[in-house]
A protein has these predicted regions:
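Extracellular glycan-recognition regions
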Residues: 1-212
């Protein structure tokens, strides 16, 4: 079976947070209570290291929270981020991060396929990190009003043992979703880069399952 591949998109000058990104792949929340689980793989371009190439799973509205796989000088990190008043340009905050294990990808071609009429160019060595990401949404009652949605974000290296990513010392922390300016809250994926370069890394979504 195939996978959905999202190449990282160069963000415009003056980019502030995901609220400025035109390339979010989102859908409306299907219910007040649901769980979305995805198996993903991130393959950043090593030539863009330390320049903000990232991808992840986001719950988007006027505020947002996300599980974000980011390529850094220390390797690929999985970050839990939140941003309040995103549409007004607020800065995103990294509240928790853990390192991910990455594996080298096979070299795409060998020297026997190289042209003999031009100087040889060493192929770029890519590494990939796989992860299972989970968004769990639950309603919270409000007196005299409709319930508000709260969300927790979870990570697993194997799809079996899950760990919530939350601010340090705040186990059970839940993000409160806010509707978008014109629509309700949405969830989905993104893959961005801040560097202007022709070649990009990518995110592959093997599958996503939405359950009660």
């Amino acid at each position: 079976m195939g996978a959905l591949r999202l190449y990282s998109v160069d963000q415009a000058e003056g980019w502030r947070n995901l609220g400025d990104s035109p390339n979010l792949l989102l859908q409306k929340t299907p219910a007040d209570s649901f769980t979305a689980t995805a198996k993903v793989r991130f393959v950043p371009n090593p030539q863009l290291k330390e320049k903000g190439e990232s991808c992840g799973l986001v719950l988007m509205g006027q505020d947002y929270a996300a599980l974000k796989m980011t390529d850094t000088k220390d390797g690929i990190m999985l970050q839990y981020v939140e941003c309040g008043n995103a549409l007004k340009g607020s800065e995103e905050s990294v509240l928790c991060e853990i390192p991910l294990t990455s594996e080298p990808l096979p070299t795409p071609y060998s020297n026997k396929y190289m042209s003999t009429s031009v100087p040889p160019v060493a192929p770029v060595s890519y590494e990939a990190a796989e992860a299972y990401l989970r968004l769990r949404v639950m309603p919270r009652e409000r007196k005299g009003d409709v319930p508000e949605l709260t969300a927790t974000f979870w990570y697993s290296p194997d799809g079996k043992k899950w760990t919530q990513l939350a601010p340090s010392g705040r186990s059970g922390h839940a993000f409160t979703a806010r509707p978008g300016k014109w629509i309700g809250a949405k969830f989905g994926f993104f893959c961005n880069r801040l560097a202007s370069k022709n070649d990009s890394g990518w995110m592959e979504i093997d599958w996503i399952k939405v359950t009660d």
